[in-house]
């Protein structure tokens, strides 16, 4: 992978490709929006993923979302010498199918509690512009699957939920995370948030 790539291979992906494919993701529970859409989803995924994991995890588990470390050979410029780009390029060369699997970075999915039965969940994924997720000129997504874990509770626990819901409604505290854009002028050494 250390040799320069030929000019025939012109399409590669950015790092953390799975999360870069979507500009925003919204979640509704029983028709109530709990994770509003925002164009900051890929940035949130980067900020929650990269500082959290060390090099060993990035080089193993994060390859499931197409993370390959950028490298440059000293004194050379461009994508052709970047080993990480070469790895990602080889994954999709000749229109190969790529399977990626990782959790979505949304407030609801960072909670430790399960949803109750009969709660309708809608997830809307909006695609990013190609120039944001791809390093090249063309692309096509063939198929996307969303895997959801389902937990089977014991009958005693379900009955306890039913009895509790007869007296009060359920409330789920959700920890909210906001990602905002701001501009820092060039040469500015102080920044107040």
Protein language model regions, located:
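Short, low-complexity Pro/Thr/Gly
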Residues: 1-193
């Amino acid at each position: 992978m250390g040799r320069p790539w030929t000019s025939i291979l012109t399409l590669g992906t950015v790092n953390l490709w799975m999360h870069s494919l979507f500009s925003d993701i919204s979640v509704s529970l029983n028709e109530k929006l709990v994770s509003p859409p925002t164009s900051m989803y890929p940035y949130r995924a980067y900020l929650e993923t990269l500082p959290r994991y060390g090099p060993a995890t990035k080089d193993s588990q994060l390859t499931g979302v197409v993370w390959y470390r950028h490298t440059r050979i000293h004194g050379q410029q461009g994508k052709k010498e970047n080993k990480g780009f070469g790895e990602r390029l080889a994954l999709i060369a000749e229109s190969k199918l790529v399977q990626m699997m990782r959790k979505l970075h949304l407030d609801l999915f960072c909670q430790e509690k399960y949803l109750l039965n009969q709660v309708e969940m809608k997830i809307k994924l909006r695609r990013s512009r190609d120039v944001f997720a791809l390093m090249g000129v063309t692309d096509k997504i063939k198929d996307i699957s969303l895997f959801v874990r389902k937990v089977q509770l014991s009958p005693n626990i379900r009955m306890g939920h039913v009895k509790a819901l007869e007296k009060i409604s359920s409330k789920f505290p959700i920890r909210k995370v906001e990602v905002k854009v701001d501009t820092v002028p060039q040469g500015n050494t102080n920044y107040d948030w």
